[in-house]
């Protein structure tokens, strides 16, 4: 997966151009016969989406997702409530628009020339490529030339069908596929993993997140180049909704909240390590159950799964782990840190976890209040790894190089510079292994994503097994 970046310049320019073109007809807060006025009169913004880790999901009763958070902010911007409808596949999403059951589709949908003939696109805020996937250990196709409908299944409404048709007409005449009208992309990915299907096609971001939980899913080849992702509304609407969307995206670009959401959901790095992810998930099954009660006990305000991910990064959940520099235990605490926390045995699992949690809380408390709440943890983790003083240097360097010291996206880009003499020689606290702190935080984020997704999958499987047992007729 290529590094994803929101096209801020495009959003800004497009906002100005469309606003100039549309403004005479759309003082949308003043008219009553337009879409925005209708939404505000109704008091509800209706958004249809797909259940996926990136777009929208519910974990322990809390809603997550890049598209969900953006949609919630847009609803707040309009001064209305948000109503989310979850559909199984893309075809059902566009049915909602056609039938007047949705104002917007916010589901990681790709901008496509065929779609824009019938639907109104919004701002394009990140990009993906479409990739053909297979299961590790099975035959990997190197080209679409020999792929046929007995091997490749696509979800209904998937935009890649248009790309496949063009490729069939221009390069691969024997290429064929089938569309399963009853299954969405997530289900098809699961069937590739289970061996029920040979291949399917999904977007690169969805695949990247899926691999954190299912490392046996592998990319065979790119089917398309990078394609922009956007929201869609009805084409026959007036322009008030489009203008409001453009103004909204421009405003969250300017205040930095768009970049923060991008960092939260797309900033976990592109590098997927099959062996490391598989080893981690094995440890989740075999080692974590014994330690889980302790992580839950001492996490307090921190997500216990994040605390567990930190511990795995530190020690691979080995209570006796020792580094060449003398740090020890599950949380790899120094002797001085352990003593300051009142710990007597760093190799005792409970003492180490409780001490590590308290030390992280101390780092969190030191992070300046100007740092947004949902990014404070990343600053704290970098400080946990390399020391708070060096985090101050990283923030100072970010200011000197015209970045935002309260933005984790900006600060993390400067961390590797802390080990380069032209930079650290001019900083208050000198040399630091900033590149290690950068990798440290990125790895923890990946482990947390894997752990959250994997545990959610297990809960789903257990619930389905329980239901099956309850429904099974007694004999």
Curated annotation (Swiss-Prot):
SMART domains: PBPb (SM00062). Coiled coil: none annotated. The active site is at 314. It is found in: Cell outer membrane. GO terms for molecular function: peptidoglycan lytic transglycosylase activity. Residues 270-475 are annotated as: LT domain. It holds the Pfam family SBP_bac_3. It is an enzyme of class 4 (lyase). Residues 1-30 form the signal peptide. Keywords: Cell outer membrane, Cell wall biogenesis/degradation, Lyase, Membrane, Signal. The keyword Isomerase does not apply. It catalyses: Exolytic cleavage of the (1->4)-beta-glycosidic linkage between N-acetylmuramic acid (MurNAc) and N-acetylglucosamine (GlcNAc) residues in peptidoglycan, from either the reducing or the non-reducing ends of the peptidoglycan chains, with concomitant formation of a 1,6-anhydrobond in the MurNAc residue. Residues 31-269 are annotated as: Non-LT domain. The N-terminal domain does not have lytic activity and probably modulates enzymatic activity. The C-terminal domain is the catalytic active domain. Murein-degrading enzyme that degrades murein glycan strands and insoluble, high-molecular weight murein sacculi, with the concomitant formation of a 1,6-anhydromuramoyl product. Lytic transglycosylases (LTs) play an integral role in the metabolism of the peptidoglycan (PG) sacculus. Their lytic action creates space within the PG sacculus to allow for its expansion as well as for the insertion of various structures such as secretion systems and flagella. This is Membrane-bound lytic murein transglycosylase F. It comes from Salmonella typhi. The gene is mltF.
């Amino acid at each position: 997966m290529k590094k994803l970046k929101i096209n801020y310049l495009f959003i800004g320019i497009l906002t100005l151009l469309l606003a100039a073109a549309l403004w005479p007809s759309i003082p949308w807060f003043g008219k009553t016969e337009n879409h925005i006025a209708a939404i505000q009169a109704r008091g509800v913004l209706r958004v249809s989406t797909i259940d996926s880790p990136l777009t929208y999901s519910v974990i322990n009763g809390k809603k997550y997702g890049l598209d969900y958070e953006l949609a919630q902010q847009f609803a707040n911007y309009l001064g209305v409530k948000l109503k989310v409808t979850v559909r199984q596949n893309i075809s059902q999403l566009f049915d909602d628009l056609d039938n007047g059951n949705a104002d917007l589709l916010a589901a990681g949908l790709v901008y496509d020339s065929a779609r824009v003939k019938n639907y109104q696109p919004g701002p394009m805020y990140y990009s993906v490529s479409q990739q053909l996937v297979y299961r590790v250990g099975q035959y990997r196709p190197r080209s679409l030339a020999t792929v046929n409908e007995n091997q490749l299944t696509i979800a209904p409404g998937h935009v890649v069908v248009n790309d496949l048709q063009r490729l069939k007409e221009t390069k691969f005449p024997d290429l064929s596929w089938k569309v399963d009208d009853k299954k969405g992309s997530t289900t098809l990915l699961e069937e590739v993993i289970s061996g029920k299907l040979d291949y399917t096609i999904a977007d690169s971001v969805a695949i990247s997140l899926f691999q954190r939980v299912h490392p046996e899913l592998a990319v065979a080849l790119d089917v398309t180049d990078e394609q922009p992702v956007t929201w869609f509304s009805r084409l026959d609407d007036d322009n008030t909704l489009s203008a409001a969307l453009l103004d909204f995206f421009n405003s969250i670009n300017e205040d930095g909240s768009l970049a923060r959401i991008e960092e939260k959901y797309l900033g976990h790095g592109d590098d997927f390590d099959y062996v490391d992810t598989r080893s981690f998930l094995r440890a989740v099954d075999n080692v974590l159950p014994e330690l889980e009660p302790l992580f839950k006990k001492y996490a307090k305000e921190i997500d216990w799964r994040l605390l567990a991910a930190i511990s795995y990064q530190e020690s691979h959940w080995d209570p006796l782990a020792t580094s060449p520099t003398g740090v020890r235990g599950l949380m790899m605490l120094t002797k001085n840190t352990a003593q300051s926390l009142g710990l007597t045995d760093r190799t005792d699992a409970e003492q180490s976890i409780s001490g590590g949690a308290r030390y992280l809380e101390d780092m969190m408390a030191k992070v300046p209040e100007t740092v947004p709440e949902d990014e404070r943890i990343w600053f704290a983790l970098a400080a946990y790894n390399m020391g708070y003083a060096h985090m101050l240097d990283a923030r100072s360097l970010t200011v000197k190089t015209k970045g935002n010291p309260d933005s984790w996206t900006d600060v993390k880009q400067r961390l590797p510079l802390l080990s380069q003499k032209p930079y650290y020689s001019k900083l208050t606290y000198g040399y630091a292994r900033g590149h290690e702190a950068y990798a440290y935080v990125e790895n923890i984020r990946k482990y947390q994503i894997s752990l959250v997704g994997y545990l959610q999958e297990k809960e789903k499987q257990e619930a389905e097994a329980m239901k099956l047992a309850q429904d099974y007729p007694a004999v």
